[in-house]
């Protein structure tokens, strides 16, 4: 389980990006973070894997406080946290298979990683993961020859190659057409259930969050204003999450 406790982040002249953020995300569930642009959604994800350093709080993955990890410990923790990006973050001239294999780099020595030394078992696993996302037939095709939706599925397979406990998805469908969006979200939901993964996803599309996720975290101006099961979200909750800063803040964040 992921537990974020009293997470605070300040930029510049005491401008709060995150204000005492608290929420949980469970294995086997897709948890969506929703809220207005600039509310702090991406900052939360980047704080979880410490791509940016927050100011205070706790980030517990199982019993490990990621914030307290030293450099060597953080490298090990990150190996169990997959990341899926809006812009795919693939090495375009390489094949789909080669990109998926890069998911094992965190488990290899620097020399083995630089030389691209992968075992036959790792190559078979990468092929199996491409099959799981419906791309086995494209294994030896360059990624810059794939569609955006196909590239995002390669990114999912690469994240799975890390043997993760959790996958962080930063606006993974923002650049996709409706058909590709459906395919990607179906895959993420299936993987959460089958592999008992924590899937934490930032979304601007409320309809997609309502259709594909189990748990909703609503953020506004850096503060969590709602947390609960997706089926608890109604129009009043959405209006509260997406309210303008000067509007009433009468609804308290759900503790579930």
From Swiss-Prot:
GO MF annotations in UniProt: ABC-type phosphonate transporter activity; ATP binding; ATP hydrolysis activity
SUPFAM superfamilies in the cross-refs: P-loop containing nucleoside triphosphate hydrolases
Keywords associated with the record: ATP-binding, Cell membrane, Membrane, Nucleotide-binding, Phosphonate transport, Translocase, Transport
Residue ranges constituting the ABC transporter domain according to the UniProt record: 2-246
Classification via Gene3D superfamilies: P-loop containing nucleotide triphosphate hydrolases
Database matches in PANTHER family: AMINO ACID IMPORT ATP-BINDING PROTEIN, PHOSPHONATES IMPORT ATP-BINDING PROTEIN PHNC
Annotated family: Belongs to the ABC transporter superfamily. Phosphonates importer (TC 3.A.1.9.1) family.
InterPro entries: AAA+_ATPase, ABC_transporter-like_ATP-bd, ABC_transporter-like_CS, ABC_transpr_PhnC, MetN_ABC_transporter-like, P-loop_NTPase
Reactions performed catalytically: phosphonate(out) + ATP + H2O = phosphonate(in) + ADP + phosphate + H(+)
GO annotations of cellular component type: plasma membrane
Protein name: Phosphonates import ATP-binding protein PhnC
EC number annotated for this UniProt entry: 7.3.2.2
Topology of this chain in the membrane: Peripheral membrane protein
Localization: Cell membrane
Gene assigned in the entry: phnC
Binding of ATP, residues: 35-42
Subunit structure: The complex is composed of two ATP-binding proteins (PhnC), two transmembrane proteins (PhnE) and a solute-binding protein (PhnD).
Function: Part of the ABC transporter complex PhnCDE involved in phosphonates import. Responsible for energy coupling to the transport system.
UniProt keyword Ubl conjugation, yes or no: no
């Amino acid at each position: 389980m992921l537990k974020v406790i009293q997470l605070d982040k300040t930029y510049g002249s005491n401008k709060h990006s995150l204000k005492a953020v608290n929420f949980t995300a469970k294995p086997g569930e897709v948890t969506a973070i929703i809220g207005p642009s600039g509310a702090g959604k991406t900052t939360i994800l980047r704080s979880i894997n410490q791509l940016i350093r927050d100011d205070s709080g706790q980030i517990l993955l199982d019993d490990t406080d990621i914030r307290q990890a030293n450099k060597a410990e953080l490298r090990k923790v990150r190996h169990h946290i997959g990341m899926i990006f809006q812009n795919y973050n693939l090495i375009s001239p390489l094949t789909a298979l080669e990109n998926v294999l890069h998911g094992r780099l965190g488990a290899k020595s620097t020399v083995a990683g630089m030389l691209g030394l992968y075992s036959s078992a790792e190559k078979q696993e990468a092929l199996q993961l491409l099959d799981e996302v419906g791309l086995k037939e494209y294994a030896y095709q360059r990624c810059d020859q794939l569609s955006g939706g196909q590239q995002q599925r390669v990114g999912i397979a690469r994240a799975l190659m890390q043997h993760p406990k959790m996958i962080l998805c930063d606006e993974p469908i923002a650049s996709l057409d409706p058909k590709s969006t459906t395919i990607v979200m179906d895959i993420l939901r299936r993987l959460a259930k089958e592999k008992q993964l924590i899937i934490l996803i930032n979304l601007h599309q409320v309809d997609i969050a309502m259709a594909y996720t189990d748990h909703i975290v609503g953020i506004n101006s850096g503060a969590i204003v709602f947390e609960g099961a997706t089926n608890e979200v109604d129009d009043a909750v959405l209006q509260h999450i997406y309210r303008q800063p000067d509007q009433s803040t009468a609804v308290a964040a759900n503790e579930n």
